Amino acid sequence: MSQAAVVYWSGTGHTEAMAQAIAAAQADLFTAAEFDADKAAHYAAIAFGCPSMGAEQLEESEFEPMFEAVKPALAGKKIALFGSYGWGGGEWMRIWEDDCAAAGLTLCAESVICQDEPDDAALAACAALGEALK
């Protein structure tokens, strides 16, 4: 098991492609349904990825409940956020970053967002995010 994990939810495959680019830096890859607080305890660094859904929010049936459940186990860990969106300007990510700050979590790198399918620049930013988890 590596010291870093990448946990994501993807509806279209865009956020999954971002997760794979981040995990290429020797991180274990999990879907939101596969991850819980017990698994979080085994990692020093975790990147969480979720696309913007509905009215600029996290996916509500799988990802958000998982994230809320693991949040207490994230204190003192390197945390990073990423995701894709179809429209809007990325407000869901700013809300998510604020939620992490309110919970006392510190992000180890600037969050990575991209509109629709990640292009080469977004994939390069994801690779850099993966390196920041080391």
Region annotations inferred by a language model:
Residues 2-4, 10-32, 37-134:
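FMN-binding flavodoxin-like domain, especially the glycine-rich phosphate-binding loop
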